[in-house]
Amino acid sequence: MNSFPLPGSGPAVVAVPAPGQGPGWWAGASSAFLDADGTYVVAYRVRNGHDGIDQTVVATSPDGERLTTVATLDQSRFGAQWMERPSIARTGDGRWRLWVCMGTPETKHWWIDVLEAGDLPGLATAEARPAFPGDDRTAVKDPIVRLVDGRWHAWICCHPLDVEGAEDRMSSAWATSEDGLAWDWHGTVLAARPGTWDARGARLTSVLPDGRAAYDGRASAEENWFERTGLAERTGQAGSFAQVDDGPVVDVRYLDVLPLPGGGYRIWYEARLPDESHELRTELIGPAATERQAP
């Protein structure tokens, strides 16, 4: 797994600065898509302080670094108290789908809706329909949704709600769909490991076509919002992943990896600043990065 595209492999660029100073002022939790014309589409979450208005932003970019906002959705539209990581994808007939992740007010419950539009700006006003509602036992959030060979796959972060005060525990589940709307749930595919650095939970953040993956882990409730990145890979069991390292590989969270057609990768990740605000950074890794650095 030494070749996994990790932060620090290329020059880092701040794609979205922290929206303010201090804890809870976060830009990050991105989901990126490379369109057929070479345009990058990046959806991400902005938290304007823990008591502020969260937003899901959709932006386009010619290079993955300079982002232009084309749609903004805030939590009030959905009656939510918070928003977290979205997921952006394109259907087989060229329409756009955006999965948005919201927290139910005054609870620890989270749910995921999906919006669909013919163009990206249309997502701002598109009808929201339930995708993964969760229930009184499980909060669902931070989706990764991909269309692969005509079949939809979703990896969902799940938080059990059975123990009050311990709702930060997390694992990753997998679901599949023929149309991306009605889902078959296959259960947990990556779980925490007791007694290790990720004992409190494991949240998939990137799944590559070759079966390699990145995930966020933490050891305790005190490390909530201070997750670090670990690596995993698919096992022989359908859909399942297993951790491949005894410790984290980098101190960032929500690592989002996009393979590029010509080789190499463009990555985005949420980086913590000394004042505990977060910014969205990006790096170009691989042959293109080497060419860019050449004198």
Which residue stretches match the model-derived regions?
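Carbohydrate-active catalytic/glycan-binding domains of CAZyme proteins
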Residues: 1-295
